[in-house]
Design a protein with these regions (language model features):
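Long, charge-dense, low-complexity tracts
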Residues: 1-131
Length: 131
């Protein structure tokens, strides 16, 4: 029983290490939550400092060198999407642009967030399995 508790505690600690928690301009929480809130327009991206976000990402990567590179890549994709969405907000719209609409970008971002959550859930299940 204590071994199971110890193993569960190790899983929780590892998951905490694998979560990028950002603290930028009045928001503190996981990066995927920030993206979700920005997608639903509950956080104003114009107030988020991309520089602070990038610095915190680099610090996270330095601390997480022993973690899987796929995890770092997922967070890089999320940070890049956040920067891209913010740039789309700050720049005037180009009527001749054939790129994706804001709704299409938000849908793609939601898909990426669902994919990341599915990977996390699967990783937790695999870590919790009996060996």
């Amino acid at each position: 029983m204590q071994e199971e508790l110890f193993e569960s505690q190790k899983i929780v600690e590892r998951m905490a290490l694998e979560t990028l928690v950002v603290d930028v301009d009045g928001f503190e929480g996981p990066l995927d939550l920030l993206l979700n809130l920005s997608r639903t327009q509950k956080v104003d991206l114009r107030k988020i400092s991309i520089l602070d976000l990038a610095v915190q990402y680099l610090v996270f990567i330095e601390k997480a060198k022993e973690l899987r590179i796929e995890l770092a890549a997922d967070y890089l994709v999320m940070a890049a999407w956040l920067a891209f969405l913010k740039s789309r907000l700050l720049l005037p719209p180009d009527p001749s642009e054939d790129g994706p609409s804001g709704d299409e970008l938000a849908t793609h971002l939601a898909f990426q967030l669902e994919r990341l959550q599915a990977m996390r859930d699967t990783a937790a299940k695999l870590m919790a399995r009996d060996r």
